[in-house]
A protein has these predicted regions:
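Short beta-strands and strand-loop turn motifs
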Residues: 107-113, 142, 245
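Short glycine/proline-rich turn/loop motifs
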Residues: 75-77, 109, 243-249
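A broad, structural surface signal
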Residues: 39, 126, 130, 265-269, ...
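Class I SAM-dependent DNA methyltransferase catalytic core
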Residues: 20, 135-137, 141-274
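Short coil/turn segments at secondary-structure junctions
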Residues: 80-83, 112, 250-251, 255
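Short histidine/acidic/glycine/proline-rich micro-motifs that form metal-
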Residues: 113-118, 146-150
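Core alpha/beta nucleotide-donor-binding catalytic domains of modification enzymes
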Residues: 1-107, 114-126, 133
Length: 274
């Protein structure tokens, strides 16, 4: 299956696809502007970077069957009760939508923070779903927590799967059940969410996020390698880029911005069964 990656970061979606049972996945390109993330991505993958999504001419993109990406949560200027494609102008989701409108891939998989569901009293999420509906996509979604996918991190994200009407409908959600590997019983070993501002924290507890763990003799911060593990990446995934070593500050940021790889793997495995 050919896919296009947007807001690609360090390649969490791509690694999840690699680990899934997809037959001969091929990335036709990715879009990323953070220079450190690009360095890491290019060290791990040999894909073309189309750069700033706002400057991509969608008509020049190769054809693909699946669009993937985690876009920022932004407010829309909604003129009426039902937001649509035109109401998303000025946001990065608009650029996702215009690529979908131009290329009409069979499937899309989008990720965002759980707060998207309640942002602006739910108006933001309604506009996103209405826009996808306007573009011909039926959608399903679910909030998934990384702790239920074999990593000890309490990280909730909403995932949206859209399928083009007239094509086979993948029944992806709900995901979960009694047979789900769950790390809730690890107690004190469960980390709170790693976010992009982790490196700015001190040895305190802020905003409900536990940034410290108990060592053998003292309390300490997580290391970048441990943050990689909590997101399901191999050790030292972010340690080096194409131009050499990456600072710990940037490694914390990139891990915090990434998706959790095992979650993507599970979703992709559900997608490709249809």
């Amino acid at each position: 299956m050919k896919y296009l990656s947007l807001f690609s970061g360090i390649g969490g979606f791509e690694l999840g696809i690699q680990q899934a049972n997809m037959c001969q996945p091929k990335c036709v390109g990715y879009s990323e502007i953070d220079k450190y993330a690009i360095q890491v991505y290019n060290k791990q993958f040999n894909h073309k970077n189309y750069g700033d999504i706002t400057k991509i001419n969608a008509s020049t993109l190769p054809d693909f069957e699946l669009l993937i990406g985690g876009f920022p949560c932004q407010s829309f200027s909604i003129a009426g009760k039902r937001g649509g494609f035109n109401d998303t102008r000025g946001t990065l989701f608009f650029d996702v939508a215009r690529v979908l409108k131009e290329k009409q891939p069979r499937l899309c998989l989008l990720e965002n923070v759980k707060g998207l569901l309640s942002h602006e009293q739910g108006a933001t999420f309604r506009t996103i779903i209405s826009t996808l509906d306007e573009l011909g996509y039926d959608c399903q979604w679910q909030v998934l927590n990384s702790k239920n996918f074999g990593v000890p991190q309490n990280r909730e994200r909403v995932f949206i799967v859209g399928h083009l009407r007239g094509t086979s409908r993948p029944e992806v959600f709900p995901i979960g059940g009694a047979d789900r590997e769950d790390t809730r019983n690890v107690g004190e070993d469960l980390s709170y969410t790693i976010d992009a501002n982790y490196s700015k924290g001190t040895n305190t507890l802020e905003k409900g996020r536990r940034q410290l763990i108990k060592g053998d003799t003292a309390i300490r911060r997580l290391t970048p390698k441990e943050c990689e593990r909590l997101q399901g990446f191999p050790d030292d995934w972010t340690k080096e880029g194409m131009d050499g070593l990456i600072s710990d500050t940037q490694r914390y940021k990139m891990c915090g911005n990434s998706v959790t790889v095992p979650v993507i793997k599970e979703i992709i495995n559900k997608l490709i069964n249809y």
